[in-house]
């Protein structure tokens, strides 16, 4: 009979099989009431599942990350329960958990309207408030199939036929009269599923195949309590205000159009931000001793066959033909950098060789996945590749890590999650090589006092990698930086150097990206700053305004002086009220507005106002210029007097 070992090391002895709920009740009624599921020997199980042998057990509650995921999964079943009551002929497909919520794909003979979604959410609340028990039954494959055939659930039958072994015992979850199929676990009672909201609908092909029927996907969010739900909805509201697509239009940064899907038309102000970002990256390339190169954006298909990209990536590559040759528009820069490395004989004395490029890349992303600047088809990578010896890996990775944190801190990103992906089952190279490579990455992180977590088996077949995910002011995750070791591509493309022993050797290649896609990073910055770019990045840094025509000459002189000082400035001499001008430029998020009236002209000064509405008073012109230059030069995130 089972001996149950709890997380604190204490043990409970039973003379009969017990469930996690039984053990929780044995510990106390409060814990039993909070129990959602159990983790038995490291595996999540339903609260009602029996434990027959000695085992470790952790009780899962809504406070646990797994508990919240289970709540969300059960809310998907609740959605199914409600939709079958409102529209009984609906056929249910799949209803998984996603970030912050869940969705269900349904086959319905009507297009759901906003009113339908509101009615569906209302019915879900009515059902959840009944606090009914969710009953799990393990049945044979044949019984499960018969159940869904009788109910007309053709998609569930297809899942059984195509994805579940005949000797398996699927779990059927009974929500009163509604039955769904799932591996589970699920909540034991619907009292855990009170805090949710349906968010939107979208189209989705069955099994993601455009040859199949288009279903309707209903998205929802679910949380453990009302406070967490409201906080999430507030974050979404704030995110909508910060949407880079909306701000990009307001500030006239860029546009996109149907004739060039996923391609950016940069307007003057947006391109100014892009170029300033390039200047910043170039300053770091110089500091960390990179050479900058530029490769062709199109190369013969034969080269991509050698690299392995054609076999593994061709669906995402654009191609074109000329003079009976097929060319691929590059989706990445690395093969081109190896071609540059291969020009001329290289010695071990030439290594490490650090090669960077603002590479114009194109990938044939599905049209439905395109999203403003965040997901595009044409983009610019701040890409670099380091050619080095195995002995140099640790030092080079160390420098890459310092560069990543150096650059992210400039933008105020402080929360960065780091993951180290290790060897997959299918890989090249010896175990000794992988041991050393993984150790080099881990030690480099440790030497920089950077906490990280392992992603076991998630590395590429050609080498382990470090991923850097930064979190913005809304606590959204953006995976931007990578440091990837590559033991394959240099060999495939015949890269070599002459070692100290006069023998030819293959260099190790380190792929390094920090911002990732320049376009995407500008989208991230637009939302992070809500369009209030720090002065050094702002397209227009200063606007000089007159109050009446009598100050026009002074405004022009001051504007010229600011331009000569390297400041991006505009003069606004329109015959409008000064309050109107200030409001307009405040909405344009111009960092500084300099107002010139008769008093300022007479004193040789200027009234300084920030876009946040702070009046800095009447200041000496040369002092203002000096302070602005210092703020811009230091790439400060703070404005004057902040």
From Swiss-Prot:
Domain TGS intervals: 1-61
InterPro entries linked to this entry: aa-tRNA-synt_IIb, aa-tRNA-synth_II, aa-tRNA-synth_II/BPL/LPL, Anticodon-bd, Anticodon-bd_dom_sf, Beta-grasp_dom_sf, TGS, TGS-like
Keyword check for Protein biosynthesis: yes
GO molecular function: ATP binding; metal ion binding; threonine-tRNA ligase activity; tRNA binding
Cofactor: how bound: Binds 1 zinc ion per subunit.
Catalytic activity: tRNA(Thr) + L-threonine + ATP = L-threonyl-tRNA(Thr) + AMP + diphosphate + H(+)
Region (Catalytic): 243-534
Signal sequence interval, chain numbering: none
Cofactor: Zn(2+)
Binding annotation for Zn(2+): 334, 385, 511
Any one biological process term the GO annotation gives: threonyl-tRNA aminoacylation
Highest rank taxon of the organism: Bacteria
Predominant place of localization: cytoplasm
Lineage, opening ranks: Bacteria, Pseudomonadati, Pseudomonadota, Gammaproteobacteria, Enterobacterales
Its biological purpose: Catalyzes the attachment of threonine to tRNA(Thr) in a two-step reaction: L-threonine is first activated by ATP to form Thr-AMP and then transferred to the acceptor end of tRNA(Thr). Also edits incorrectly charged L-seryl-tRNA(Thr).
Tagged with keyword Transmembrane: no
Family from the record: Belongs to the class-II aminoacyl-tRNA synthetase family.
Protein name, as recorded: Threonine--tRNA ligase
The organism of origin for this protein: Salmonella paratyphi B (strain ATCC BAA-1250 / SPB7)
Keywords: Aminoacyl-tRNA synthetase, ATP-binding, Cytoplasm, Ligase, Metal-binding, Nucleotide-binding, Protein biosynthesis, RNA-binding, tRNA-binding, Zinc
Record-listed E.C. numbers: 6.1.1.3
Cell compartment(s), UniProt: Cytoplasm
């Amino acid at each position: 009979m089972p001996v149950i070992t709890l997380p604190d090391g204490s043990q409970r002895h039973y003379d009969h099989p017990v469930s996690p709920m039984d053990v929780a009740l044995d510990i106390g009624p409060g814990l039993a009431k909070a129990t959602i599921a159990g983790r038995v020997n490291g595996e999540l199980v339903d609260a009602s599942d029996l434990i027959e042998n000695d085992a470790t057990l952790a009780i899962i509650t809504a406070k646990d990350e797994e508990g919240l995921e289970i709540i969300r999964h059960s809310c998907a079943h609740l959605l199914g329960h409600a939709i079958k009551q409102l529209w009984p002929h609906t056929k249910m497909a799949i209803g998984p958990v996603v970030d912050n919520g869940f969705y269900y794909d349904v086959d319905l003979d009507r297009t759901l309207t906003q009113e339908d979604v509101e009615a569906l959410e209302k019915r879900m609340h009515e059902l959840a408030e009944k606090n009914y028990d969710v009953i799990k039954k393990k049945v044979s494959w044949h019984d499960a199939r018969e159940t869904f055939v009788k109910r007309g659930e053709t998609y569930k039958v297809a899942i059984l036929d195509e994805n579940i072994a005949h000797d398996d015992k699927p779990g059927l979850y009974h929500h009163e009269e509604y039955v769904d199929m799932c591996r589970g676990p699920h909540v034991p009672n619907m009292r855990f599923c009170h805090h949710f909201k349906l968010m939107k609908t979208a189209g989705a092909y069955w099994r993601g195949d455009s040859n199949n029927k288009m279903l309707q996907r209903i998205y929802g969010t679910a949380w453990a309590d009302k406070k967490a739900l409201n906080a999430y909805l507030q974050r979404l509201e704030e995110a909508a205000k910060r949407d880079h697509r909306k701000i990009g239009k307001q500030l006239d940064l860029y546009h996109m159009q149907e004739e060039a899907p996923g391609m950016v038309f940069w307007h003057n102000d947006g391109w100014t931000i892009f170029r300033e970002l390039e200047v910043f990256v170039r300053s770091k390339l110089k500091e960390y001793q990179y050479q900058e190169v530029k490769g062709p954006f199109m190369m013969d298909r034969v080269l991509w066959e050698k690299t392995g990209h054609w076999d593994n990536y061709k669906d995402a590559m654009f191609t074109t033909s000329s003079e009976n040759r097929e060319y691929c528009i590059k989706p990445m820069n690395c093969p081109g950098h190896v071609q540059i490395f291969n020009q001329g004989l290289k010695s071990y004395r030439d290594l490490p060789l650090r090669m960077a490029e603002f590479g114009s890349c194109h990938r044939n992303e599905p049209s439905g996945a395109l999203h403003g600047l965040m997901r595009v088809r044409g983009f610019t990578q701040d890409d670099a590749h380091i050619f080095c010896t195995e002995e140099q890996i640790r030092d080079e990775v160390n420098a890459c890590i310092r560069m990543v944190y150096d650059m992210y801190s400039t933008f105020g990103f402080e929360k960065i999650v780091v993951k180290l992906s290790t060897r997959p089952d299918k890989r090249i190279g010896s175990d000794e090589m992988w041991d050393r490579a993984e150790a080099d990455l881990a030690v480099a992180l440790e030497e920089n006092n950077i906490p990280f977590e392992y992603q076991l088996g998630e590395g590429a077949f050609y080498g382990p990698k470090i991923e850097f995910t930064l979190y913005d002011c809304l606590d959204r995750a953006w995976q931007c930086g990578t440091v990837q070791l590559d033991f394959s591509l240099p060999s495939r493309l015949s890269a070599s150097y002459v070692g100290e022993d006069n023998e030819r050797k293959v260099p190790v290649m380190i792929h390094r990206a920090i911002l990732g896609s320049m376009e995407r990073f500008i989208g991230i910055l637009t939302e992070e700053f809500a369009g209030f770019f720090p002065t050094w990045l702002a397209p227009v840094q200063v606007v000089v305004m007159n109050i009446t025509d009598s100050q026009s000459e002074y405004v022009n002189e001051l504007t010229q002086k600011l331009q000569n000082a390297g400041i991006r400035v505009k003069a606004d001499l329109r015959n409008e009220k000064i309050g109107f001008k200030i409001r307009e430029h405040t909405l344009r998020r111009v960092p500084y507005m300099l107002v010139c009236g008769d008093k300022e002209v007479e004193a040789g000064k200027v009234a300084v106002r920030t876009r946040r509405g702070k009046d800095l008073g009447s200041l000496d012109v040369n002092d203002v210029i000096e302070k602005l230059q210092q703020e811009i030069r230091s790439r400060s995130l703070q404005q004057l007097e902040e």
